[in-house]
Amino acid sequence: DWLKFAAVVAQLAILSLLVVAFNVETQAFRYVLALSAVGFVIHHLLPLRFRITFFGLLSIVALIVAFGVEGAWAEAVWLLGLGGLLIGLAHVPIPFLARIALIVGTTGGLMAMRAGVFPAPWNGLLWPAFGAMFMFRGMIYLYDLRTNAAPFSLSRAVAYFFMLPTVCFPLFPVIDYKAF
C-alpha cells in the first residue's frame, strides 16, 4: 500500500515540477497545486476522523493563497464571510421556508450588487469563485439538509463549499453533498 502511495506522490511531484518548468497556468494555480500536493500527503497520513476538517482548512488556505497572489486579500476575506453567512443562514433555527426566504433575500441583494444596482465593496475577482462555490452546491446542500440525507457539521460544510479545486477552476463540476 505504501508503494502505491509513493507512486502517486511521485507522479504528483513530477506534475508539479512540469507545471512550474513550463509555466503552465497562473502563478496562483501553481501555488495552489504545490499546496495541494503537500496537503495530499498530510491528508493521507491523518486519521480518518481528522481528514474532513483538514481538507476544509486546506481549502480555505488555498483560497487565501490564490486570492493573495492576485493581491486580493480583502476579496478572500469577503468570500469567506459571505460563504459563512450563507452556511449560517441555512442552519438558523427557524422553519425551513423562512431560512429559504432569508437565503433568497440575501442572494437577491448579492445579485443586485453583481448587476451594478448597488456598489459592492470588493472587485470582480470574487464573483466567479463565489458563484462556483455556492450557486448549485447551495441548492443541493439545502435539499439534503431538508431531507436529512447526509450528516451535517461545520467542517463538512466548509470543506464542501470551499472545496480546494474550485478556487482555480470555477467550472469545477457540481458535487453531490451526500456523496461528498
For the regions a language model picked out, list residue spans one by one.
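Short hydrophobic/aromatic-rich motifs at helix boundaries and adjacent loops
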Residues: V9-I14, R30-L33, T53-F55, P151-F152
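Aromatic-residue hotspot detector
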Residues: L15, Q27-A37, F136, P165-T166
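Short, hydrophobic transmembrane alpha-helix segments
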Residues: S16-R30, V41-L48, V65-E70, G88-H91
